[in-house]
Amino acid sequence: MSTIENFDAHTPMMQQYLKLKAQHPEILLFYRMGDFYELFYDDAKRASQLLDISLTKRGASAGEPIPMAGIPYHAVENYLAKLVNQGESVAICEQIGDPATSKGPVERKVVRIVTPGTISDEALLQERQDNLLAAIWQDSKGFGYATLDISSGRFRLSEPADRETMVAELQRTNPAELLYAEDFAEMSLIEGRRGLRRRPLWEFEIDTARQQLNLQFGTRDLVGFGVENAPRGLCAAGCLLQYAKDTQRTTLPHIRSITMERQQDSIIMDAATRRNLEITQNLAGGAENTLASVLDCTVTPMGSRMLKRWLHMPVRDTRVLLERQQTIGALQDFTAELQPVLRQVGDLERILARLALRTARPRDLARMRHAFQQLPELRAQLENVDSAPVQALREKMGEFAELRDLLERAIIDTPPVLVRDGGVIASGYNEELDEWRALADGATDYLERLEVRERERTGLDTLKVGFNAVHGYYIQISRGQSHLAPINYMRRQTLKNAERYIIPELKEYEDKVLTSKGKALALEKQLYEELFDLLLPHLEALQQSASALAELDVLVNLAERAYTLNYTCPTFIDKPGIRITEGRHPVVEQVLNEPFIANPLNLSPQRRMLIITGPNMGGKSTYMRQTALIALMAYIGSYVPAQKVEIGPIDRIFTRVGAADDLASGRSTFMVEMTETANILHNATEYSLVLMDEIGRGTSTYDGLSLAWACAENLANKIKALTLFATHYFELTQLPEKMEGVANVHLDALEHGDTIAFMHSVQDGAASKSYGLAVAALAGVPKEVIKRARQKLRELESISPNAAATQVDGTQMSLLSVPEETSPAVEALENLDPDSLTPRQALEWIYRLKSLV
């Protein structure tokens, strides 16, 4: 923007704009002018591209035309949504002065800043997904990370010890906006993320952070929150809170506490595991065919968001899990009655956040009233549930009869969208408002009486009394009778076929009515603000109620899913291990047209690793993933898809399943595979569940086999993790003979001619055949290629019998086994030309060959 240098040459209005823009140089400024928000200079050019709106010019200032783009004020939410989705931030500048009394430009100021991580408006948020603002800090000891959901007040911090853990946290939370210090060293960690915001170093100072947080919570120290000894997390939290206050331009009373998230409290899953298990997002980036898509039939948006948080942070405290299990069991007979009532509660959590920010709209208060109206029925239904946790939730949700009564008296049944539209406050709530409204609403009766009286007095049958927005009240007489108008009629407007007049009495009434409308609207706005003052003292109790209602929704939903999908309650045991009878994949069984083949699983300290073999498409990956998903579901307290499950303590879940080139980071498929494998070998423990699928595929046969063997050996002997190890290297099926705690299982298939039928059934022992050519034929590889492959296979088998796919001691040998060393006798015979030998030489060769054998 080439405008600041010649500031004095600009018009007063543009000087005002430039001052405001200088305070917000890096974000778009929406500058209110009448019924439009205008953007100027570079902002206008940028907005025209981002929003696909016209770029025009507005006169000239300082001798140059001003690039300009504008949007109507009533459509601002739609445009803000588009900008926020593209990671943009916008400063909203409103007229706060009165144009009638202003000398020079009307006074304006920025009233709020809309950023991707601090939005609370319903139109800008995805209702079933958390919208997080995050801050990241790093020093020599590790990372500090804080997140805030401003639409609920949920404030969390953590201190990831290393880069891998930090990557996993970023993927788990997926913030809409991320604040980082200007000297942040690990830029490769956050590059390419949406909503990145560079902040000055002083915003991350620990003393400033403590002061900010104590001021927010009204405390002297942070010991009560359990975060006192988390300096790196506090640095991030302090910056985050300051940014939230700067953008909202108001107090944040709904942010009442901060919670420390500790690694030892939940099952840790790295970024690769979250991606491969498709918990809330599938591998293509969508939400279809994910674990959440099967489990989430919650009836409130806040319940849906809570369930997704549970899925991404499975808890390790079995007391919490047993309580959830018991609650789900107790609720199974009540889901049909509870869910329709819960559905009416809506998104109370986010409504309360808007109330706290004083941005709640009339329909928010109407929805809050509707939520309160459901509480008596909910409480009555829950009274019959024989469960201490359910009764605790019932008490926590409260009843709020006084607030319900207040909103029933104060707000009409179906209020308009905005307070400025008027007609929000119900009749009978305020006597003065009723009087002003009566004066304004009584105009119709008065005009009808005036019309009758004036017709009789003047004898003019074409006389009418009316009103329009431009000229106000008038008396209209047709052109043919206008010459008979009384002398006290003052002409106001001439039409083609009529004249319009005003009389002193009508003018006086007009002033009174217009004044009454203005006063009624002003009083209505005042009463609406007073409603906030009456509701906000109850904010803490209301937030507890919303949290209880969301949790009830999640538990009722899990009870309904358990009953509908035939899930069973898992049993927690003290020793490491997983025993599953008739286990099923929760997602695959829902998308299959035929019945899902259930399979058993047995992992224990004596049987720590399963080597899984079988054909591609046989179901190895499904079997492995279903084990991890059953474990994950058990550790959120849910019932699971199996006939019976016993599960021991788990600290981490790792998956090394499939890979693609990471082109952005310049890493090959094999490099990605080895990086993920290294992470597992460094961090897995005897309490970890590890899924390893096809390790070593991305390199040469011998390198790959050697790596796979060494990894399996390390996991089984040194780490002793519970491991499912799928492989095409049949040499690995010898591992059970060489070490304890390892067993072979395989997924079977039947081959008939050129066709193959996958049984999807897990059997003990190693696979007998790879079925590679049959799978290739099934995939549509041309017949001549399959035919040539069969010829080549026979050729290889005949050349090197040891390399053939034959069964040796119950173990299938690799097609590419190392050939045995050729004997000297064979080498000598190969170099011999029998036609050139004399009888004596032939006899000598017989003795020589005899000595070589």
From Swiss-Prot:
Keyword DNA damage listed: yes
One Pfam short name: MutS_II
Function, in words: This protein is involved in the repair of mismatches in DNA. It is possible that it carries out the mismatch recognition step. This protein has a weak ATPase activity.
SUPFAM superfamilies: DNA repair protein MutS, domain I, DNA repair protein MutS, domain II, DNA repair protein MutS, domain III, P-loop containing nucleoside triphosphate hydrolases
Designated name of the protein: DNA mismatch repair protein MutS
Keywords tagged on the record: ATP-binding, DNA damage, DNA repair, DNA-binding, Nucleotide-binding
Source organism (scientific name): Escherichia coli O81 (strain ED1a)
Record's GO cellular component terms: cytosol
List of residues binding ATP: 614-621
Lineage of the species this protein comes from: Bacteria, Pseudomonadati, Pseudomonadota, Gammaproteobacteria, Enterobacterales
Similarity remark: Belongs to the DNA mismatch repair MutS family.
InterPro entries according to UniProt: DNA_mismatch_repair_MutS (IPR005748), DNA_mismatch_repair_MutS-lik_N (IPR007695), DNA_mismatch_repair_MutS/MSH (IPR017261), DNA_mismatch_repair_MutS_C (IPR000432), DNA_mismatch_repair_MutS_clamp (IPR007861), DNA_mismatch_repair_MutS_core (IPR007696), DNA_mismatch_repair_MutS_N (IPR016151), DNA_mismatch_repair_MutS_sf (IPR036187)
MF GO annotations: ATP binding; ATP-dependent DNA damage sensor activity; damaged DNA binding; mismatched DNA binding
GO biological process: mismatch repair
Keyword DNA-binding: yes
Signal sequence coordinates: none
